[in-house]
Amino acid sequence: MIKNSKTLWQKASKIIPGGNGLLSKRPERFLPDGWPAYFRKSKGVFIWDLDNNKYIDMSLMGIGTSVLGYNNSFINKFVKKKIDEGVNTTLNCTEEYFLAKELLKIDKFADQIKFARGGGEAMSLAVRLARSKTNKSKIIFSGYHGWHDWYLAANLQDVSNLNNHLLKNLKPLGVPKILKNSAIPLEFNNLKELIKISKQKNIAAIVVEPSRFKYLDKKFVNYLNKICKKKKIILIIDEITSGWRECLGGVYKKIGLHPDVVVYGKALGNGFAISALVGKKKVMDTAQDTFVSSVAW
């Protein structure tokens, strides 16, 4: 039934570590030997695999990216137009400015925007800016925030620290040991733990997801807002998964969080690679003081 997919996956696994670039799309995480690894085409909620089997995607819709459906004709019309005009030149594209203006209308707390490609690199950038602004090192986090060193550093202290978000007992190989104790995990909605951890010194930022199966509760949110304001800790809201799914912009508005920076990804591009940091000028301006630059941004 899925012969062509299985054959290609076996070949790919020999020349690509893990078979592909994204852990969440590997067949063994769903149904080993029974999950179609590849798609041939897609439209709306439907996917066709290499053996021409047709499926309704009741899973993650592109790992949370395609809230407007696959292969959206309205979006494709504008993308194709831009491709025909030219995509990347020595000069800047005007769309960067116009999209920034539109996002600032939605996130009224913010003054400035910085774009990136994937959610993980956008989170890494947000953490860099927080550390740059505060001249402090520690990051308290609650949620899944990518694969970069700042995040995996949590497992330098205890290999189980990221068990709720990544592979069990993941050894952070390749992450400099000097980063030990720089990333402090915080259990989702655990107010007592937040009160205890926030007493530490040298905290640059607290990073949270506003929802993960459920919302942060009111007492947690109120204390988080209060302690960040009191201790001048940068509050970063990771809306990469939650953003644009329930409301225009981020869930943080619905539950009363007062962010300094909000990070969007996934659904922002409906399958096209784009992410954004939306934040207050006092934080975003530090991008001029620390080097952040990419030809693909």
Please name every model-derived segment.
Residues 1-297:
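Conserved N-terminal phosphate-binding loop of PLP-dependent enzymes in the Aspartate aminotransferase
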